[in-house]
């Protein structure tokens, strides 16, 4: 079976592309990136996954992202190397950003159409070359694609424009699950909320109905009871559960104290205290953001004020403190962050 790797943008159009591709492929792994260095980081992850895969046939699908010349050349060169190892790999980039025009003219696999959104390009391309898994899904998929197209190219008279605006805000503000710590879960959460739109597309007042129900739909998607639990508690419980599944990979040690390291979670007070209460084998919780700022929390088992002073030129309280990492190297890879923290702790 062909293995598909789908890299897409982090806005409504980008995620809608992946909602579409999941209707055509069973064996698919999705990745998302904003522009800049994250694109190269995700391409590297895909190539690494191919190198480790036992499959022999692959499709790399890139949507709603325009690669620069260096990124396109790197991807093509690496694919050629894999092909020499008897791996059948196809590349297809489907985009609509005019900034990719020059690169599109240099690579046959780079398709550019500035008149349609990426979701519509992806849908029409896949419909032409592959069979949809459930043909009945076209009854909601096609109008959903048209809705995304209307709002993405800002056709105010287009189909579902107002509903598309609600969806655009939904994607932008659905940050309950951190993208860097919970990549798959974050994506699946957004795709689930987007797919829920199929139940509203044909309602008379669809934009208002979906907008009114969205908060409740979010609670349900996060595994909570919308009539009995607050979003704060539902979100914290969901995140704590996911963090607990990562205990082995995210453990760090400072002297005789065991800590949990997260990256770019932000606003950790409620989450950290809940995590430490439910996981008493941990003495402290720490979160590092993209600028190297450190937040530390404890529950009486570790003096994080002293830890922060010794390791991060910071301070605060025994159970709540903060600091900053000197010479911090930003990364889109959690392992890189953890290695920096381990180096600091080992040298403290």
UniProtKB/Swiss-Prot annotation:
Temperature dependency: Optimum temperature is 30-40 degrees Celsius.
Domain of life: Bacteria
Enzyme type, top EC level: hydrolase
GO MF term (any one): nucleotide binding
CC cofactor: Mn(2+)
InterPro entries: DHH_sf (IPR038763), Nucleotide_metab_enz (IPR052968)
pH dependence: Optimum pH is 4.0-4.5.
Protein keywords: cAMP, cGMP, Hydrolase, Manganese, Nucleotide-binding
The keyword Hydrolase belongs to this UniProt entry's keyword annotation: yes
Membrane-traversing stretches: none
EC number(s) stated in the UniProt entry for this protein: 3.1.4.17
Annotated catalysed reactions: a nucleoside 3',5'-cyclic phosphate + H2O = a nucleoside 5'-phosphate + H(+)
Protein function: Hydrolyzes cAMP to 5'-AMP and cGMP to 5'-GMP. Does not show phosphohydrolase activity toward various phosphatidylcholine and phosphorylated sugars.
UniProt xrefs under PANTHER family: 3',5'-CYCLIC-NUCLEOTIDE PHOSPHODIESTERASE (PTHR42146), OLIGORIBONUCLEASE NRNB (PTHR42146:SF1)
Name by which UniProt lists this protein: 3',5'-cyclic-nucleotide phosphodiesterase
């Amino acid at each position: 079976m062909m293995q598909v790797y789908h890299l897409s943008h982090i806005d409504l159009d980008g995620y809608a592309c992946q909602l579409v591709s999941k209707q055509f492929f069973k064996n698919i792994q999705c990745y998302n990136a904003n522009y800049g260095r994250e694109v190269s980081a995700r391409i590297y992850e895909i190539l690494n996954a191919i190198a480790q895969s036992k499959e022999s046939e692959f499709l790399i699908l890139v949507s709603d992202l325009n690669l620069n010349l260096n990124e396109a050349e790197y991807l093509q060169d690496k694919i050629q190397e894999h092909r020499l190892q008897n791996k059948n790999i196809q590349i297809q980039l489907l985009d609509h950003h005019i900034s990719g025009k020059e690169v599109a003219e240099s690579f046959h696999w780079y398709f550019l159409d500035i008149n349609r959104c990426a979701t519509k390009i992806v849908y029409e391309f896949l419909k032409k070359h592959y069979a949809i898994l459930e043909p009945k899904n076209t009854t909601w998929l096609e109008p959903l694609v048209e809705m995304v197209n209307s709002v993405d190219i800002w056709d105010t008279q287009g189909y579902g424009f107002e509903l598309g605006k609600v969806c655009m805000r939904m994607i932008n503000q659905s940050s309950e699950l951190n993208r860097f710590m919970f990549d798959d879960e974050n994506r699946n959460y957004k795709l689930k909320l987007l797919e829920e739109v199929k139940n509203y597309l044909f309602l008379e007042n669809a934009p208002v109905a979906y907008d009114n129900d969205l908060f409740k739909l979010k609670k349900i998607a996060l595994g909570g009871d919308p009539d009995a639990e607050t979003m704060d508690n539902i979100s914290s419980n969901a995140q704590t559960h996911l963090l607990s599944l990562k205990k082995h990979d995210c453990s760090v040690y400072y002297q005789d104290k065991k800590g949990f390291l997260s990256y770019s979670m932000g606003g950790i007070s409620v989450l950290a205290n809940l995590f430490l209460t439910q996981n008493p084998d941990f003495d402290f919780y720490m979160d590092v953001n993209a600028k190297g700022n450190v937040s530390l929390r404890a529950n009486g088992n570790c003096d994080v004020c002293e830890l922060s002073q010794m390791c991060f030129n910071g301070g605060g309280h025994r159970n709540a403190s903060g600091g900053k990492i000197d010479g911090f190297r930003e990364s889109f890879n959690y392992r890189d962050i953890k290695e920096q923290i381990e180096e600091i702790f080992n040298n403290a």
